[in-house]
Amino acid sequence: MILAIDVGNTNTVMGIYKKDKLIQHWRISTDKNKTPDEYGILFLNLFNSANVNYKRIDGIILSSVVPPLVRILKKMTTRYFNLEPLVVGPGIRTGINLKMDNPREVGADQVVNAVAAYHKYGGPLIIVDFGTATTFCAVSERGEYLGGAIAPGIGISAEALYSYAAKLPRVEFKTPGQAIGKNTVAGMQSGIIYGFVGLVEALVKRFKDELKETPEVIATGGLVSLIASETDEIDKVDPFLTLDGLYYIAKINGIVE
């Protein structure tokens, strides 16, 4: 079995693959202050709760946009699983050609998403990831990573409202049903949800105009279903795109079950 670990700024997602199939997955809060032992105990408890034998893990792959956690999780996997993880970064084979001014600047999560989406759907593609940041990337018909856009995520945009506007309350992330809100909460929900729908539609249109092709639009991330249900610009929702990409990269680099 292969353990894939995707460390984001807000959440860390783990998945176990067996014979090309995702058989178990978890989402926890990312905490760079946890020690290797704390993460180790947490992982083992999750495995035990799902009746998964951690001793049957044959390989581990790790992607992180939080640099301090790479060292912590490497210590954890070495100590508790007796395995050195493959860390996604420069020098790792991905099968994707990064057509960027500085390929080293591309986030590991974006590379992993591009690998998964191209492997599963072919190209050309636009990939939208609703995470701490909302990221867009374009992949050519030949599997080249062409570049992208980075916008604030839904969560941090809403947090800015709460933090800088004293009278605005925290609101539940849900579709208000109409754009013209009849109260403060509905107005905020409209601005947050429909505002992000507009962001997605505008950037996807600009990407399509610049690509001069008809790409398929794939969306992933924690709040993807909320936005995808309000627009026709998203063709497919793939909640496990990043984990799948990690698994494909593990196989490309010789980590097999």
Swiss-Prot record:
Domain of life, per lineage: Bacteria
Gene Ontology process terms (BP): coenzyme A biosynthetic process
Binding-site residues, ATP: D6, V7, G8, N9, T10, N11, T12, V13, T132
Pathway: Cofactor biosynthesis; coenzyme A biosynthesis; CoA from (R)-pantothenate: step 1/5
Residues where substrate binds: G107, A108, D109, Q110, T184
Cofactor binding description: A monovalent cation. Ammonium or potassium.
Catalysed reactions, semicolon-separated: (R)-pantothenate + ATP = (R)-4'-phosphopantothenate + ADP + H(+)
Cellular localisation: Cytoplasm
PANTHER family: TYPE III PANTOTHENATE KINASE (PTHR34265:SF1)
NCBIfam families: baf (TIGR00671), PRK13318.1-5 (NF009847), PRK13318.1-6 (NF009848), PRK13321.1 (NF009855)
Function: Catalyzes the phosphorylation of pantothenate (Pan), the first step in CoA biosynthesis.
Entry's family note: Belongs to the type III pantothenate kinase family.
Protein name (Swiss-Prot/TrEMBL): Type III pantothenate kinase
Source species of the chain: Halothermothrix orenii (strain H 168 / OCM 544 / DSM 9562)
